[in-house]
Amino acid sequence: MLVNGVELRDDVFNVEPKKHILWDVVRWQLAKRRQGTHSTKTRAEVNCSKKKIMPQKGTGNARHGARSANIFVGGGVVHGPTPRDYEYKLSKKYRKIALAMALSTKAKNNSVYVLESLLSSLGKPKTKVAFELLKEKGISDKKVLVVTKDQNDIVSKSFKNIPNTKVLPVVGLNVYDILWADALLIEQGALEKIYERVNL
């Protein structure tokens, strides 16, 4: 598949996207991110006396047991949230298919740009040079995901102060961030690693 003058492999960049698969993987990613530390105290856990607050009969009031009951202020919470792990499993093959589908959605929209090198010749980070690169491609006003072969501090710091721009090495490439972006800026050397990673 030819995108912006670069030949891309069809089994990675020309896969028919299926919404339910992409939705599944995005939901899985967001679930994995959740802390799950939400917590409330039940009537057994709140700090107050468990003594019956008034006699059962003779007062004219409704029957009550302990002050820790949920109907009192400061009492326990019934069926409240407790700490839990939201993570669940998706097969590796399913995740690879979703990654190929996400990349394909960008390729079909001509939103994939491949560069021979990404600021690798710079000795130190330069935001101005990074912004000029985006302007040259006509994507300076878009949400851009920059994909590098490996972790590259010069590239990361150069793009860091540009709004709506993320930098990820191939090992961190994921469906959520690909779908978030309007355009993908991929380093030439990263393509082979992407092919290795998807490897359907």
UniProtKB/Swiss-Prot annotation:
Matches recorded under Pfam families: Ribosomal_L4
One cellular component term (GO) for this entry is: ribosome
| Any one Gene Ontology molecular-function term assigned to this protein's record | structural constituent of ribosome
Its biological purpose is as follows: One of the primary rRNA binding proteins, this protein initially binds near the 5'-end of the 23S rRNA. It is important during the early stages of 50S assembly. It makes multiple contacts with different domains of the 23S rRNA in the assembled 50S subunit and ribosome. Forms part of the polypeptide exit tunnel.
**InterPro entries per record:** Ribosomal_uL4, Ribosomal_uL4-like, Ribosomal_uL4_dom_sf
Q: How does it assemble?
A: Part of the 50S ribosomal subunit.
Q: Which family does it belong to?
A: Belongs to the universal ribosomal protein uL4 family.
Q: Which UniProt keywords apply?
A: Ribonucleoprotein, Ribosomal protein, RNA-binding, rRNA-binding
Please report the name of this protein according to its UniProt entry. Large ribosomal subunit protein uL4
HAMAP family, per the entry: Ribosomal_uL4_B
